[in-house]
Each structure stands twice: as C-alpha cells, then as structure tokens.
Amino acid sequence: HAFVCGVPGAGKTNTMLHICYSLWKNCNVPFLVLEPAKKEYRALSQTDIDDLIIFSPSSGSRFPMAINPFEFAMGLSLSEHIQNLMNVFEGAFPLTPPLPALLDRAIEGVYNDHGWDADDINEGNKEYPTISELYDRLEFELKNTDYDGEVRGNMKSALEMRIGGLLRRDLGNVFDVKISSLKPEELIQHPIIIEMESMGTGPSNF
C-alpha cells in the first residue's frame, strides 16, 4: 500500500499516472482507478496503453458503464455474495434496523425467483436478478411485515431514497441492467479507469 500526499501542484497526479503506466507497460500488472472527481487520469489514453478501458457513467457519455450488482464471480457461493452485497449496501447508505434484515431477505428472495439457492456456487448457468426486481421484492416484503402504518411508511420512504435512487435517470442506466459491461473477474484483468464525478456520493460509494 502507498499513501500519496502533497500540497496542490506538488505532482501527486503525475506521480500516480507514472505509477499506473509503469505497472501495466513494464510489469503487465493491471490497475483499476476509481476517480471521484475530475477526469485527469484520461491522460493515460494519450500514451501507448492501447488496451486502456475508460468508463464515465453520465448522460450522453461516450464511455457508458453498466454494473449489475447481482452478477458475481464464477466459483463464488451465492451466500458469500449476498453477504458482500449487504456490506456494500450498508457501507453506501445509512440503513437502520430493521431495514438490513428486510433487505437481506429481499436479496435472497430475488435470487430464489431465478432458481438460485443460498449454497449454490456460481457456474455461469443461471440468470441474475436486477435492482428493479429487488425494489419490487422489497415492496412485497414490506407489505407483509407486522409493523404499524407509520413505521412501515418510514421504512418505505427510506427504501425509496436508497434503492429507488439507483433506478432513476443516469443511475438506472448504470445499475438497473441484466448484464455488466465487464464480468466481475475482468475488472482486475485490464487497465481500467472509472470516472464517478457525476454519480453522487451514495451511488459512488455503492
């Protein structure tokens, strides 16, 4: 690990550009740049890294990106991926009890709808759910809880803000898809830049 710091203009970005370039061209080590602001790492496209992949999810982008969070690596168990998904959701959005339990149940439910069992190992022969299916499943699970009207209404509002936000406009084009632009394992096999400036804090964390 390395921590690169310095005052503005000290050369932090140029240092990182040099490191990324050298890793791929000299050592054949792929890199994944998550750029939360600006588009400075596009400078690498002006070098001789011919296989550089750039994603810039935004309206009218020339470099669109699609990520289905329910698609996971071959050889991984569904149970393990559901736990990873829960960690991602809880890290990206504030979820107070009982929302995590409801979300966990809904995630497993949408996989069940596509023929998955929790102990299944991904062999690439089953379809993955989508975010819109999760949203519909959450509404179903919420209607079947024993919470009173006010609590249920608060939970519905929270889910609308968190999960519903991933369905609207540009974010829907990124996350509410059946197939990702790259398979999960491919994200660590190529030199890749993902520009996240237009996505907002919560979705970027997600």
Model-identified regions with their sequence ranges:
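The conserved Walker
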Residues: 7-8
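P-loop NTPase motor domains
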Residues: 18-206
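Hydrophobic anchor at the beta1->P-loop junction of P-loop NTPases
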Residues: 4
